[in-house]
Amino acid sequence: MGLHLTVPGLRRDGRGVQSNSHDTSSKTTADISRCPQHTDAGLQRAATPGISRLLGISSRSVTLTKPRSATRGNSRYHWVPAAAGWTVGVIATLSLLASVSPLIRWIIKVPREFINDYLFNFPDTNFAWSFVLALLAAALTARKRIAWLVLLANMVLAAVVNAAEIAAGGNTAAESFGENLGFAVHVVAIVVLVLGYREFWAKVRRGALFRAAAVWLAGAVVGIVASWGLVELFPGSLAPDERLGYAANRVVGFALADPDLFTGRPHVFLNAIFGLFGAFALIGAAIVLFLSQRADNALTGEDESAIRGLLDLYGKDDSLGYFATRRDKSVVFASSGRACITYRVEVGVCLASGDPVGDHRAWPQAVDAWLRLCQTYGWAPGVMGASSQGAQTYREAGLTALELGDEAILRPADFKLSGPEMRGVRQAVTRARRAGLTVRIRRHRDIAEDEMAQTITRADSWRDTETERGFSMALGRLGDPADSDCLLVEAIDPHNQVLAMLSLVPWGTTGVSLDLMRRSPQSPNGTIELMVSELALHAESLGITRISLNFAVFRAAFEQGAQLGAGPVARLWRGLLVFFSRWWQLETLYRSNMKYQPEWVPRYACYEDARVIPRVGVASVIAEGFLVLPFSRRNRVHTGHHPAVPERLAATGLLHHDGSAPDVSGLRQVGLTNGDGVERRLPEQVRVRFDKLEKLRSSGIDAFPVGRPPSHTVAQALAADHQASVSVSGRIMRIRNYGGVLFAQLRDWSGEMQVLLDNSRLDQGCAADFNAATDLGDLVEMTGHMGASKTGTPSLIVSGWRLIGKCLRPLPNKWKGLLDPEARVRTRYLDLAVNAESRALITARSSVLRAVRETLFAKGFVEVETPILQQLHGGATARPFVTHINTYSMDLFLRIAPELYLKRLCVGGVERVFELGRAFRNEGVDFSHNPEFTLLEAYQAHADYLEWIDGCRELIQNAAQAANGAPIAMRPRTDKGSDGTRHHLEPVDISGIWPVRTVHDAISEALGERIDADTGLTTLRKLCDAAGVPYRTQWDAGAVVLELYEHLVECRTEQPTFYIDFPTSVSPLTRPHRSKRGVAERWDLVAWGIELGTAYSELTDPVEQRRRLQEQSLLAAGGDPEAMELDEDFLQAMEYAMPPTGGLGMGIDRVVMLITGRSIRETLPFPLAKPH
């Protein structure tokens, strides 16, 4: 599996930490055995990318500035650990150099002797002391408290020695100076260390001091014995009785005893060996002493159960989330229990595995807890495999994000083997199928135990490494009963022998993520491609919508370096990666994923200081199994003993000891999905209503009961006889409470009435109960009899009532309603609830639609429905909406007009046909345009466009009669008076015959100069320039005439007017005029600047129709998005002969606008609105 490294920084804010620890073993990874005779690279989810992280940084990296501090906070002594570490580190370095170089030893002889005598132990040649000082320096820098104690003890002891020497006296002036200076330095160092005590917070293991002493003693004894033996073999000039003491002095005495005490010397090379023996003993002891808290256990059953619960609740977007259940990881939870981070500690680096698991809103809490844990034990934090969202969370915690590669994601809905880009995969699949291979796909739960055992045996035997690899993208187990939802894909030969397998873990409920891949050495080339392809092609039957394949490290470098025109740096970087791919298969892994044309999703590393990247790289290599340390417990079974789940979550009793997932509904009930600082924030009025709802439920009242029909509407109740028994239902719009008597305004669709609740007339309860239980906007059912209030207002005298719908949000202003037009569009339901005008518009629109249908039905028209999804866009010149059908892997268009299908029906003999439905055009949005709209298209055989002049007028006048009660249109009017400006609507009579004018006559009148169909293009352009009408140079004369018409005629028209005889070139589906050259039999109906409809004498000549559509298709091929495409099926239908036909197209939305005097956004129930 690929590796993802990060080295985050540290944060502490005083909160508690829940964690458990683990040992360093792991079990399995996803890789594939490769044979020399096969070139099928397959998809290896091996740790090759992990090795590559040692090479450097990705060519596509993003470095982000830390937005906030990631440390405990800066005290005045925060510099003490670093200063102490650097000081000891310098001495360690010089000591090591002096031990191996006589020249260095001679150069530093004088200062070394002074430091050694008065300040700090600094022998001339002692590897042991050099390594011990180096470890001490590292521990001090890491803020280890035990290192602070060791250094402080050394300083105190040295100060005591110097004080004793000063008190004894008898020293030379130089010696007195050195002792006084040393004593002063020690006192200052002790004071500084004591003051900086709180800066050394990192803990070590319990009993570390005793373990370190035991390790050192054992190592020293072995070293002394070995050294004594060497001295006996090579004594040099040492006397026999001095050999044991000399060896002991060199091994464990740090050469502190004066060499002059010994009369002889052994061979020179032995001193270095003796120092190494001592170094080994001291290094072992120091490692044990300074080692941070280590993990002796891993996930417990409760931990794994909690993680699975979080995955069920929140894991649908994390392709690597299931790998958090790998059992050689430890886990730390957010205090809320709603998120956690799994990690593992290697060589002092705490490697977090991917994103936090759980609620995204609780991720910062989990990251804080993890960083506090790292800081507590002095670990260097690192993250492997963070997604973009996860990397952003780590960045907000003070880290830096670096993009290292990309994860390959297959979308089965888009996957296909056809096309030139899939040629390689297609050929590989063909070879595998020719070899007789078939693919079997099953869930692990459907596999028998004995068969699963065989599967595990095959996976082990086909592994090309001695141990399993993987950490961040490998589960580490196969066939575990807890992983019953995992998917097994097997390639089977004609003899029913399994030759290869894929195991994939769940990714939410609709995805799978590759865990393990194996293949037999006898498997034919193309086996892996066959399994992946079959999985993708049959994913729908398995309920799978996404497949995570692999991680390709440095993908961008390979891709960009191979591009034409790539720069020298990009080419050089790619060349280096190709070179290293000879060993680590970096390019092979990239290409084996790329051939499936996946979606590449970036994965990130995070770190605080670039200096620790090599250390984190080593830790990741160890975690992924590429570097196996001595005494490694990687292959051991891991079962934790100390749960890390927060007490709040453990106390629920929902977690299972066997690690199985808890009851998700139970987790929701205990508030795991809505707790600790990220609860739903609600306005105060809404919270009050929610509280009231809870009180009603606790009292046994169902605020949302099953409905029952009322006996009357409000309007019917108001018209009922006095004392008539009625029941009505509606929304409470107003409440007036007078103690024992309460008045409320009740509104339903038919109207509004007053209801009266009098304590003396209620069958149960009192008016106060109603007032306490209800709010404005609630839906109630009232039962009683009709009567009147004391003022004579008709009222329903209530005897009983029932709450049938609790309104949890307050209604808008009860007097003004919704005033903001945008708010009225976005919340049309509220607009209808409080505004009578909006309800009237809905009713008027319904009346218009009904009147149009009834008028056409009365004339013998048949209503039909034609496809909305069409393979070609035609029937009008407009920009279409494009969508995609996965089944056939092809683009489709939302229809811009139903014309071409309705004409097919005309060819089939349907003589009078219409469709009233939705059309879609990807054009502008304004007061008269909406991307989706209601369109009427009607076709009448043996008629022409003049026939439809009377037909269209009749349709609109009948619609106006149905909506307004008379053939009138409502027009906006503004009156200015002494009391200000007043806007209102006034009726305009639209009965009678409407004017009919030719297009060219209307333009001529507007220009004051005569034009006709024969007017040349040059003349028309000059007229445009004079009138200020824009045009394009590629337009012909017909298009220029149409532009003049739109600017000078259409927008200035008020009373409904028919403009007839448009230029032929702008009417591709219209019959040429029967007597006038250059124009077509077409009219447009315009009223108050808006086009309401158009009608044609339809073009029925298939030869001419083909010629015109071919011209349109050339325009489309030239880049015109509105030009129609060539519909060969339609043209073939026309060749069977269509009768002479008149066709009408009318925009119903605009007719409603005309009749109601409102904009299109007001007349549509739900017009398209931009998102918030």
Curated annotation (Swiss-Prot):
Where found in the cell?
Answer: Cell membrane
Its BP terms in the Gene Ontology are: lysyl-tRNA aminoacylation; phosphatidylglycerol metabolic process; phospholipid biosynthetic process; response to antibiotic
Could you tell me the superkingdom of the organism this chain comes from? Bacteria
EC number(s) on record? 6.1.1.6, 2.3.2.3
Q: Which keywords describe this protein according to UniProt?
A: Aminoacyl-tRNA synthetase, Antibiotic resistance, ATP-binding, Cell membrane, DNA-binding, Ligase, Lipid metabolism, Magnesium, Membrane, Metal-binding, Multifunctional enzyme, Nucleotide-binding, Transferase, Transmembrane, Transmembrane helix, Virulence
Note describing how the cofactor binds? Binds 3 Mg(2+) ions per subunit.
Query: What membrane topology does this protein have?
Result: Multi-pass membrane protein
**Which residues take part in binding Mg(2+) 2?**
E1091
Q: Which residues cross the membrane?
A: 80-100, 122-142, 146-166, 177-197, 214-234, 272-292, 497-517, 612-632
Query: Its catalytic activity?
Result: tRNA(Lys) + L-lysine + ATP = L-lysyl-tRNA(Lys) + AMP + diphosphate; L-lysyl-tRNA(Lys) + a 1,2-diacyl-sn-glycero-3-phospho-(1'-sn-glycerol) = a 1,2-diacyl-sn-glycero-3-phospho-1'-(3'-O-L-lysyl)-sn-glycerol + tRNA(Lys)
According to its UniProt record, which cofactors does this protein need? Mg(2+)
Q: Which InterPro entries match?
A: Aa-tRNA-synt_II, aa-tRNA-synth_II, aa-tRNA-synth_II/BPL/LPL, LPG_synthase_C, Lys-tRNA-ligase_II, Lys-tRNA-ligase_II_N, Lys-tRNA-synth_II_C, NA-bd_OB-fold
Residue ranges for the region (Phosphatidylglycerol lysyltransferase) are 1-663
What family is it from?
In the N-terminal section; belongs to the LPG synthetase family.
Give the misc comment: There are two lysyl-tRNA ligases in M.tuberculosis.
The name under which this protein is listed is: Lysylphosphatidylglycerol biosynthesis bifunctional protein LysX
